[in-house]
Amino acid sequence: MLPLMLAASALRAQSGTTPGAKYVEKIPGTLITFEMLPVPGGSVTLETAAGPRTVQVAPFWMARTETTWDLYDVYVYGFDRSAPRMPGEEAVSRPTRPYVLPGDAFGHDGLPALGMSFQAANAFAHWVSVRTGRTYRVPTEAQWEHACRLGAQSTADIAARSWARENAEQRTHEVASKPADAFGLHDVLGNVAEWVAGVDGDSVAKGGAYNMAASEMSCSSRMRQTAAWNETDPQLPKSRWWLPDATFLGVRLIRVPDDSTARGTRRP
């Protein structure tokens, strides 16, 4: 785990390369919205098993908050089905409904969606793309860490801006209920860890969660999935969609700018 100051020194943000202004996305057929912030391009140095690796990051947008249950429920339960169908919607996969909703005891409205598998997170991003006509994705590790470092936080900042073991009372909290980081993103560190496509080709979770100490959180914090994340799943084979014991794991969407703005289209 690299100290925040060393991490910040590895970042070379390029001015004038933002993808555009911030905007609010709305899911057709619903009242659900979420805000996207532009992230400038740059380069970021990541720690890998083979040593440091510098990755160039093109400009993109990132969601201001972690995905909430309010939005994820629309995807899971099809609350958008009354809206006009979009081209490509027949290829959208939706999760099976969980036997017990992960983290159900925490509450629901305004809280981060959690316990979805990496496959489910990617399918969710595809659904948002089809419904909006814009290309949404689960971030790569380089994109996520680049955005995190732009809002680089000191140890004192993390304690004040993050839901961690010291203040979270072993549960998630409403997104954006803590102050944003210097870049305007909420809960990048803490609350729930966030799925990314790892630089080494594996899926990993970044940023730490409410059950971690604030001192353990940094932009380079990462977790790999273990068997314990779906240990209590009663299904055989176990669900591809849900990790019932990963009540500390969510997702934050990004959008790439070189897409079509025509609704219902989606570039690979």
Language model features: what each stretch is:
Residues 32-43:
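Mature N-terminal segment immediately following signal peptide/propeptide cleavage
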Residues 15-16, 21, 118, 179-181, ...:
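Disulfide-stabilized, aromatic/cysteine-rich ligand-recognition loop
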Residues 27, 52, 174-177, 241-245:
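Short Gly/Pro-enriched turn/cap motifs at secondary-structure boundaries
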Residues 56-157, 255-259, 264-268:
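Active-site microenvironments of metalloenzymes and redox enzymes
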Residues 1-2:
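N-terminal export leaders
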Residues 160-189:
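Short, well-ordered junction/capping motifs at the entry into regular secondary structure
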